[in-house]
A protein has these predicted regions:
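Acidic-and-aromatic substrate-binding clefts and catalytic sites of carbohydrate-active enzymes
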Residues: 148-151
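Acidic, histidine-bearing metal-coordination/catalytic regions of metal-dependent phosphoesterases
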Residues: 1-140, 153-201, 206-299
Length: 300
């Protein structure tokens, strides 16, 4: 059957036309934890408004001293290209992540509500690129790395498949909520316009676990298992991935707002917490394997 799509607004603008500004949260609103997504709208969190556009900057600093362009008599377009970076397509249901570090604020890269919709955000960005391309053709695109959040095969395939315009199943493991939870539902990605070639760079999150630790055997095995990883404070503990003491948490994909599960001190759990199901597609990729997947694409 035909899968749903998520078309963007027909009016597509750039920062030359307008900018985006957050609406200040009322002083009477309570402070919310990042995980309290269900209360964001009620208390005025996450709202934004349009602001004035920004003029394009002339990079005269790369020209000869004293150059102003005043003597120029002819204009010509050299290249027109797009860049995307730090997309962090995330398997929010994986047992090997670090949600605990960000669930109460402080480390937004460890937890953010946007984790539920990373493939959808990328799909919207691709549609925006296509719309701009139709107005004024783009020569090529550059993706500058941190495509994935944590070296996982399924994260990389989601990324490539969104660019290729494939059907996207944004869930993993038990694939719960695929009929009832918005962020879990299968959908048809728009795909990047086939006339735009694109080039890829490897980022730290693409070959390090969470961007800063080479995955060891414990992490590699945890990724394809059910047990939520048990780690210490990786920021200060010299034992690194060999440290223990805290379960790092995961997301329950059967819940409307992506409830955090299995996060907290080891002593708070009678039984070690688990995700709903293991998934071999969560496996960690080596650099060679990661690069190899880009030869399995129908775009670019």
């Amino acid at each position: 059957s035909k899968q749903p799509t998520y078309p963007i607004d027909s009016k597509v603008v750039t920062t030359v036309d307008q900018t985006v500004h957050p609406v200040p949260v009322s002083s009477t609103s309570p402070k919310l934890l990042p995980t309290e997504i269900s209360k964001y709208s009620q208390y005025g969190y996450g709202l934004w408004q349009a602001g004035e556009g920004m003029a394009l900057q002339k990079r005269l600093d790369i020209m000869a001293p004293g150059f102003s362009g005043a003597e120029a008599r002819h204009e010509a377009k050299l290249l027109r290209f797009f860049t995307i970076s730090d997309i962090h397509v995330s398997d929010k249901e994986t047992p090997a992540q670090a949600i605990l570090y960000g669930a109460k604020g402080g480390v937004s890269s460890a937890y953010s509500g946007v984790m539920l919709y990373t493939t959808h955000v990328l799909d919207a960005a691709v549609q925006t690129i296509n719309a701009i391309h139709r107005k004024n053709p783009i020569d090529f695109g550059l993706s500058l790395g941190d495509t994935c959040n944590s070296t996982q095969y399924n994260e990389l395939r989601w990324y490539i498949d969104v660019l290729d315009g494939k059907v996207i199943d944004p869930s993993s493991g038990a694939h719960v909520g695929t009929r009832t939870v918005d962020y879990q539902k299968t959908y048809q990605a728009a795909g990047l316009d086939k006339d735009i070639p694109w080039y890829q760079v490897l980022g730290n999150h693409d070959h390090f676990w969470l961007g800063f630790m080479p995955p060891d055997d414990y992490i590699r095995q945890a990724l394809v298992g059910e047990n939520i990883v048990n780690l210490g404070n990786l920021f200060v503990d010299p034992r690194g991935l060999e440290s223990r003491g805290f379960y790092m948490g995961s997301i329950d994909g059967s819940t409307t707002y992506g409830d955090v599960i299995g996060a907290g001190p080891e002593k708070a759990f009678v039984i070690p917490p688990k995700v709903l199901a293991a998934d071999p597609d969560r496996r960690s990729l080596s650099k060679k394997e990661w690069i190899g997947e880009f030869f399995k694409t129908s775009s670019g």
